[in-house]
């Protein structure tokens, strides 16, 4: 959700006006995702690096997020949307943490779509913490499935109450062409769509266009293109000891 501040500055408005407009855009895209039968949607609301912004802006963002959560709980319940806030919680205001936990509990039965919101989130921190805290007695390790054990630790560290799995499509607004420390592990084979539109102006039409673009792509996950697979026998993956 990139470009809120620049959207406001272009209009001679304070940055907080851009963040408020961005919250309205988030609601539109959540509704569009639910209508499009998207199983899981993750919004990058506040990165760990965002703490370096001016104190007044950070305070406004946290207040806005708290109000947004409180206002959206009933809407999520009505529409079968399950909320999960991922990221660190030890640096958040205790009152906000309580509201997060309440929102997750009240929406836990939602089955239509999983909505994850990343707050105080850093993918590099998540990977580093998980590597450090992976349980050496994890049964997955003895079975040779180190990745499953690591991913379980990753989910615990980031308060991911529901495993969302790998990211299929990453959409970034605001004209930037980089991942910015977002879901680096989960985006290993994600398709990327970058748009110049600032987040407050990002529309349902652009969201649906990105989904259509994704549907037209051939995803190989390291394999050969379809044409080559049809003419060559499938090679067995090498075994390393």
Predicted regions and their residues:
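Flexible, compositionally biased loop and terminal segments
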Residues: 1-241
């Amino acid at each position: 959700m990139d470009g809120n501040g620049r959207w406001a500055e272009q209009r001679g408005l304070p940055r907080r006006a851009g963040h408020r407009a961005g919250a309205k855009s988030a609601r539109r895209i959540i509704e569009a995702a639910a209508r499009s039968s998207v199983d899981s949607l993750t919004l990058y609301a506040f990165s760990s690096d965002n703490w370096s912004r001016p104190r007044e802006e950070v305070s406004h963002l946290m207040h806005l997020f708290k109000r947004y959560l409180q206002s959206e709980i009933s809407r999520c319940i009505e529409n079968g949307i399950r909320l999960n806030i991922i990221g660190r919680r030890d640096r958040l205001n205790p009152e906000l943490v309580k509201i997060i936990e309440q929102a997750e509990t009240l929406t836990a039965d939602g089955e239509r779509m999983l909505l994850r919101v990343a707050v105080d989130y850093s993918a590099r921190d998540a990977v580093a913490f998980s590597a450090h805290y992976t349980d050496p007695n994890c049964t997955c390790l003895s079975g040779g499935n180190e990745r499953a054990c690591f991913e379980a630790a990753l989910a615990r560290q980031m308060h991911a109450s529901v495993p969302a799995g790998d990211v299929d499509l990453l959409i970034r607004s605001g004209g930037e062409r980089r991942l910015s420390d977002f879901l680096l592990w989960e985006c290993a084979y994600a398709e990327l769509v970058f748009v110049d539109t600032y987040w407050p102006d990002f529309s349902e039409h652009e969201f649906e266009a990105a989904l259509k673009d994704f549907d037209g792509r051939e995803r190989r996950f390291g394999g050969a293109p379809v044409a080559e697979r049809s003419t060559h026998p499938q090679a067995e993956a090498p075994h390393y000891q």
